[in-house]
Curated annotation (Swiss-Prot):
Substrate binds at residues 8-10, 144, 179, 200-201. Gene3D superfamilies: Aldolase class I (3.20.20.70). Involved in the gluconeogenesis. Catalyzes stereospecifically the conversion of dihydroxyacetone phosphate (DHAP) to D-glyceraldehyde-3-phosphate (G3P). GO terms for biological process: gluconeogenesis; glycolytic process. This is Triosephosphate isomerase. It catalyses: D-glyceraldehyde 3-phosphate = dihydroxyacetone phosphate. One of its GO terms (cellular component) is cytoplasm. The keyword Secreted does not apply. The keyword Cytoplasm applies. It comes from Aeropyrum pernix (strain ATCC 700893 / DSM 11879 / JCM 9820 / NBRC 100138 / K1).
Length: 223
């Protein structure tokens, strides 16, 4: 598979309005310029409109509820109906139970959607991988948003996570996240066995988001 650059837009100011549309156009450019898959993990409120600009969009969360009377919840079917590629679930800023994760993965698979399941530890990554999501993102929460890259500060977390997932679910890709800021951080993550990276502030707070995504993508691209 191609290396993956997943950008969690979170709720930064640049995740909405014209900034979000510009980011989607930038992601499309990078995906054309480099042989790397770029995924935008967007807020629910504008995910479908961004998917009209760039086709590889996930939502940041989904709930294990069916369509119907569930005010304020996001059924997985909503992502399918809006033409999105997939859903992210269990980010450290929005943790869910294992039963919740299991239900979302099962429903998404039945609808042909991808799932990026987040995990804080190698052990949690392996448990998530048992459910057969498309990808698992391993992010030590204490490094998220710090600019201290997991690939440099805690490389053993990546190697242990990759090994743990491979033992239980060899087909599930592992992304490394937390503190990934520069191209060198992304390159090192791939060298440690990850299939890509999950980033947020490095891109969302960058003065030049296109340039930052290009830097990260080029660092992971296979020669």
């Amino acid at each position: 598979m191609k290396p993956v650059l997943a950008v969690n837009m979170k709720t930064y100011s640049s995740a909405f309005g014209e900034g979000a549309r510009r980011l989607a156009r930038d992601a499309a450019r990078v995906a054309r310029e480099v042989d790397v898959r770029v995924i935008l993990v967007a807020p629910l409120i504008n995910a479908s409109s961004l998917a009209g600009v760039y086709g590889d969009v996930y939502i940041q969360h989904a709930d294990p509820v069916d369509l119907g009377a569930h005010t304020g919840y996001t059924p997985v079917e909503a992502a399918a109906a809006e033409g999105l590629r997939g859903v992210m679930v269990n980010h450290s800023e929005h943790k869910v139970t294992y039963r919740h994760l299991q239900a979302v993965v099962s429903k998404a698979r039945s609808l042909g959607l991808e799932v990026l399941a987040c995990a804080d530890t190698p052990e949690e990554a392996a448990a998530a991988a048992l459910l057969r999501p498309s990808m698992v993102a391993l992010e030590p929460p204490e490094l998220i948003g710090t600019g201290i890259p997991v690939s440099q500060a805690k490389p053993e977390v990546i190697t242990r996570g990759v090994e743990a997932v491979a033992r239980v679910a060899p087909g599930v890709a592992v992304l490394a996240g937390a503190g990934i800021t520069a191209g060198e951080d992304a390159r090192r993550a791939v060298e440690l066995g990850a299939q890509g990276v999950l980033v947020a502030s490095a891109v969302m707070k960058a003065k030049d988001p296109h340039g930052k995504m290009l830097e990260l993508a080029e660092a992971m691209a296979k020669p």
